[in-house]
C-alpha cells in the first residue's frame, strides 16, 4: 500500500514533513514519528518538520519544529500528514518542493499532493505511519514509537471510537516493542491541574440542548477573555464534555476567536461530516470541524444538526 511513498522517500535526500495547523496529538505524533523513523532507517537523509507551535503536545520527545528556508525546498520531498484539505496545512511552502506526498485518514475532499494514500478506515494518521513502518520492515526507533502511540491514543479516544479495530491493537502492540512505558503517554495526556478540572466543570454547566437533543456550548469573545484560556483548550479541549449524555448522539462546541467561530462537531451515531463540509470544514464521519464567520452562521449550523438528529438528511 505504501510502496510509492517509500519510493519517494528513497529518491530524495531532503525530506520536509508538514501537518495541519493547531495540531492535535495525531498531527504531532505522525509528524514526529515519521521524522524519526526516516532518520533511523535512512541516516544519510536530511529530515525536517515544520508548522506552528506544537503547544500542549510539547511533551512528545522530538516534536520541536525546525527552521527551514525556502531554498531548502528545492529538490526536496514534502510529506503532508493528517490534512483533509489544503487550507488546513500548516506552512504552505510544501508547494515549493520537487515532489509531494500525502498520508491521511480523513474523508477525501480533493487531491493535494502528487502521490496520496487516503485511508478513512484507519483510526489515526499515526496508525498509517505505523503500518508503513511495518510494511517496510523498518527499525523501530523509541522516539518514533512513543510519538506514534500518542497519536493513536488521542485519535481513537483511548481505543474507544468505532474506527478502532483489531489492526489498531496489532499496530499498538508493534509500537510497544520499542520499550516505552504507557505512563509516559497517558500521564502527560490526561493528568490535569485543578484549574483545568474546574474549567471543565464550568463548561459542563454551560451545556444546552436543542429541540431534538443536540447538545451545544457557545463561548463568545468576552467570556474567552474573562476565562483567560487559549482557543484550543476551549474549542477542541472542551468538546467532549458533552459526550456520554444519555439521549444525545450529536454535540457541537462553538468558540469565538479572532479568526471566526470555531465549530467542533461530534457524534456517536450520525455522519456529521456533510454538515462540516457545508460550512467550509471537514474531517471524519463522527468528528469534524469548521470555522464560520459569526454567531448567526453557527446557529444555522446548529439548526442543520438539529434536523439531522431528527432524521433529516443534510
Spans of features found by a protein language model:
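Active-site cofactor/cluster-binding pocket
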Residues: 61-115
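Solvent-exposed alpha-helices and their adjacent loops that cap or buttress functional pockets
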Residues: 71-72, 93-95, 109-110, 140-142, ...
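Hydrophobic helix-and-loop "lid/oligomerization" segment in the mid-to-C-terminal part
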Residues: 2-18, 29-58, 71-75, 157-314
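Short glycine/serine/threonine-rich phosphate/pyrophosphate-binding segments
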Residues: 26-31, 87-89
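Short glycine-rich anion-binding loops that position phosphate/pyrophosphate groups of nucleotides
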Residues: 21-23, 83-86, 106-108, 221-223, ...
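Short alpha-helices
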Residues: 106-171
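Histidine-centered active-site/metal-ligand motif
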Residues: 18-20, 26, 103-106, 284
Amino acid at each position: 500500500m505504501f510502496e510509492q511513498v517509500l519510493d519517494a522517500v528513497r529518491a530524495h535526500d531532503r525530506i520536509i514533513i508538514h501537518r495541519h495547523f493547531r495540531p492535535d496529538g495525531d498531527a504531532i505524533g505522525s509528524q514526529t514519528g515519521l521524522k524519526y523513523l526516516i532518520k533511523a532507517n535512512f541516516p544519510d537523509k536530511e529530515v525536517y518538520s515544520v508548522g506552528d507551535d506544537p503547544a500542549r503536545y510539547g511533551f512528545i520527545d522530538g516534536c520541536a519544529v525546525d527552521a527551514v528556508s525556502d531554498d531548502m525546498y528545492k529538490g526536496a520531498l514534502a510529506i503532508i500528514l493528517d490534512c483533509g484539505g489544503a487550507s488546513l496545512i500548516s506552512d504552505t511552502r510544501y508547494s515549493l518542493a520537487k515532489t509531494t506526498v500525502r498520508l491521511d485518514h480523513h474523508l477525501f475532499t480533493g487531491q493535494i499532493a502528487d502521490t496520496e494514500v487516503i485511508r478513512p478506515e484507519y483510526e489515526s494518521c499515526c496508525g498509517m505511519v505505523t503500518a508503513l513502518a511495518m510494511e517496510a520492515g523498518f527499525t523501530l526507533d523509541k522516539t518514533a514509537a512513543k510519538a506514534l502511540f500518542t497519536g493513536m491514543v488521542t485519535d481513537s479516544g483511548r481505543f474507544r471510537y468505532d474506527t478502532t479495530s483489531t489492526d489498531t491493537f496489532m499496530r499498538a502492540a508493534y509500537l510497544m516493542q520499542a520499550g516505552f512505558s504507557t505512563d509516559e503517554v497517558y500521564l502527560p495526556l490526561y493528568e490535569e491541574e485543578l484549574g483545568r478540572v474546574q474549567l471543565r466543570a464550568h463548561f459542563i454547566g454551560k451545556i444546552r440542548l436543542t429541540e431534538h437533543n443536540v447538545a451545544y456550548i457557545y463561548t463568545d469573545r468576552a467570556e474567552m477573555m474573562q476565562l483567560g484560556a487559549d482557543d484550543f483548550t476551549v474549542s477542541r479541549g472542551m468538546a467532549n464534555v458533552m459526550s456520554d449524555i444519555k439521549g444525545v448522539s450529536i454535540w457541537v462546541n462553538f468558540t469565538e476567536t479572532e479568526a471566526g467561530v470555531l465549530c467542533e462537531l461530534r457524534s456517536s451515531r450520525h455522519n456529521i461530516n456533510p454538515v462540516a463540509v457545508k460550512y467550509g470544514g471537514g474531517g471524519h464521519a463522527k468528528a469534524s470541524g469548521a470555522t464560520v464567520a459569526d454567531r448567526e452562521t453557527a446557529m444555522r449550523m446548529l439548526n442543520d444538526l438539529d434536523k439531522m438528529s431528527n432524521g433529516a438528511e443534510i
